[in-house]
Regions:
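Glycine-rich phosphate-binding loop of ATP-dependent small-molecule kinases
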Residues: 2-167
Length: 167
């Protein structure tokens, strides 16, 4: 990986965009940390997208990602990619299927534009069984060093495991 990263940096022909998505506790953060260990972190830009800010709500939906895209020759890692909000909003009943379809169409157009501009997009979905997800949530919750990571929304999403898997 390190050699490939330096080849990318030297050629500066295209940016690499890595999307890490998946169920809660599947290891997205750990995967990002490993990539930082295996490659030169000076040339990796990592972004963990959370709740929309007031400014982001006033802008087009892809703006928050657009401004964080890596330049040619660099790597950008996104946790909580542009797929996260549309999927969670649909699973939690905040949007209907028709709106999800529209959002997915916008995402496809966004990714197509990035690819047409030469970007390489690598998308990874990290999965856990429902049982293993529950075990990891409980383990994180019990440990005083990691309990802060488990929020009410994590348990709310866990209860919607089957619906999220279908979407």
């Amino acid at each position: 990986l390190l050699d490939a990263q330096f080849d990318l940096l030297q050629s500066a022909r295209f940016p690499v965009i890595i999307l890490l998505a998946g169920v809660d506790c599947a290891g997205k953060g750990e995967t990002m940390n490993l990539l930082h260990e295996w490659m030169d972190p000076r040339h990796i830009e990592s972004h963990a997208q959370r709740e929309l800010t007031d400014e982001e709500r006033e802008r087009p939906s892809m703006w928050r990602y657009w401004r964080d895209l890596p330049p040619k020759g660099k790597i950008g890692i996104f946790i909580g990619s542009w797929y996260s909000s549309p999927l969670i909003d649909n699973v939690q009943g905040r949007t209907k299927n028709a709106e999800l379809d529209q959002q997915l169409d916008r995402i496809i157009r966004f990714e197509t534009m990035l690819c047409n501009e030469g970007a390489l997009i690598l998308k990874f979905w990290l999965h856990l069984s429902e049982e293993n997800q529950k075990k990891r949530l409980k383990k994180l919750e019990k440990d005083p060093k990691t309990s802060w990571r488990v929020k009410d929304t994590d348990w709310k999403n866990y209860k919607m495991y089957d619906r999220l898997r279908l979407v």
